[in-house]
Amino acid sequence: MSNWYKPAGSLKTSEHEISLSPQDSGWEYCGFYTYNFATKSEFTVELNGREGVLLPLSTQNVSVSVDGQAFTLKGRTGVFAAVSDWIYLPVGSKVSFSGKSGEIALLTAQASEKFPVCYTPAEQVQVEVRGSGKATRQVNNIATPTSFTQCHKILVCEVLTPGGNLSSWPPHRHDKFPGCPTINEEVYYFQIGKEGSDHGDPEGVGFFHVYTVDETVDETVTLHDRDTYVVPHGYHGPSIASPEYPMYFLNVMAGP
């Protein structure tokens, strides 16, 4: 198995539920961090040379300060419950956020152009149903080229796949092959749900396929709740949700 697969708990630190810097991944741009307010009620981060997206996963009424400017994130009870509001964080900003319980994600990208801080309410997040048949899934466009242009490098979206369906289809890549001019690193963070629950559940499993043209990597991983997978290059897909166990994944992408 490649070292691209990061099982749940393997990226935990004293400060983070998940801490995945560009250096940890052996690449240049994408960072992925999650924080649990049950561990600590307030966190402070300085985004030196980075821009970011602050996105509640399973927390509500989060107080946020971005370079002294105050915001409140309404959040959500869990990723399967609803779309959440979020905040774009400028390059070089100092960010503090506090809450009583639950988890929040900070997605980052190495960047140099500075854009203003921006709060986006949940009702303004562009939600689309993509695919058909067993490839039907919901995409929440957080910071994508069609939904948010006031950023430099970062791209963030959420995908919810009903139990028994698949997503990341057809298999695709972002490494400047003919017909695709972009180069993007990509992080997948998964939660495996259970019918009728707002949260991930340790009972279910899903599956994820990744392969490279030179066949140095060709693997299908059995996914458990809160697993992470980094994709520096190569084809990825499908992501398969087992019957009765819907799948959520959060993507962050960035590149030159």
Locate predicted features.
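Short, structured patches in soluble enzyme cores that scaffold and shape functional sites
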Residues: 91, 99, 106-111, 143-146, ...
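A short hydrophobic beta-strand segment most commonly corresponding to one strand
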Residues: 101-118, 245-256
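Conserved metal-binding segment of the jelly-roll/cupin
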Residues: 80-100, 109, 222-243
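Extended, compositionally biased flexible segments
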Residues: 31-98
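Glycine- and acidic-residue-biased ligand/ion/polar-headgroup-sensing regions
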Residues: 45-71, 163-164, 175-227, 239
